[in-house]
Amino acid sequence: MKELELINIIKEQTQSGYIGDDCAFLKDLNIVVTQDNFIEDVHFKREWATPYQIGYKAATVNISDVLASGAKPAYLTVGLSAPNDIDNDFIKELYRGISDGAYGAKIIGGDITGGNKLFISITAIGTTKDRKISSRSHAKPGYVVITHGKYGESAKGLEELKQGLRKSDSIRAHLEPKLEPEFSEAISCNIREDYAMMDTSDGLADALYKIAEASNVTIKAKNIEGIFGFEDYHLVAAVPDSFLNKIKFNYYVIGEVKEFDCSYLNINNIKYYDY
């Protein structure tokens, strides 16, 4: 079953109006909330990463969603299930990584239990005061699509790990992704119009497709290097063209939003009807 199908079943059963974006926006409380699991042999292998790197990435996958919403990272709770071979030094380094990967957010609690595999479940809270919060359903015809950073390094790093390599710039990009709080702040603190923003944890092309589908538009994009990669954790946003001169941060334009035309995503005139 695809992730979207599963999400739709959960939405139907819970009748929740908060499910759909990577963060739930609780407007009356001025916060966003998100949660991600980080599971050994699913999302990482202990032989490929240091305890610090495991903790760092476990935090950044959550903080990235907070930044994609436009909010400011504020708090984390950490649920940890650890096997018996995890020692005190491992835990110290793991939590040092979580703290560094929190980008200023404070760890305020959590839960600890035993288990057969290392399992980290983090809930992140961001504050929304003086910020305009994004939604993937807010891309509109006439908007331009912007992003920042180089794509494809994380996917390259994973392949190198599979080949037995342990150190390279690409491997570090995969294990210790650098987030973009400045990009998020440059948009959310200055924009007044609705806009759509996501991180590219599942790939740039995937994020573009999800924004277009949620907004019922077509995004026409350039086929830049790494567009079909994954886990780069850059941000991509669809914003009004008139807003570009207000952004005091490096970015580049990769596409434009059009009225829906048969497919949600068009990359160099190749239409993608599903992704």
What are the residue ranges of the model-derived segments?
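Short, compositionally biased
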Residues: 156-173
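General beta-strand structural signal in soluble alpha/beta enzymes
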Residues: 18, 32-35, 106-110, 124, ...
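N-terminal glycine-rich phosphate/pyrophosphate-binding loops that anchor nucleotide-derived ligands
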Residues: 1-60, 64-67, 129, 143-144, ...
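Acidic, Ser/Thr/Pro-rich beta/coil linker or hinge segments at domain junctions
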Residues: 174-178, 247-275
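Short hydrophobic/aromatic beta-strand micro-patches
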Residues: 125-127, 236-240
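Active-site-proximal betaalpha loop/short-helix elements
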Residues: 83-85, 173-232, 274
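Glycine-rich anion-binding loops of enzyme active sites
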Residues: 38, 72-159, 256
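Small-aliphatic-rich amphipathic alpha-helix that forms the alpha element of a beta-alpha
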Residues: 51-76, 93-101, 182-186, 190, ...
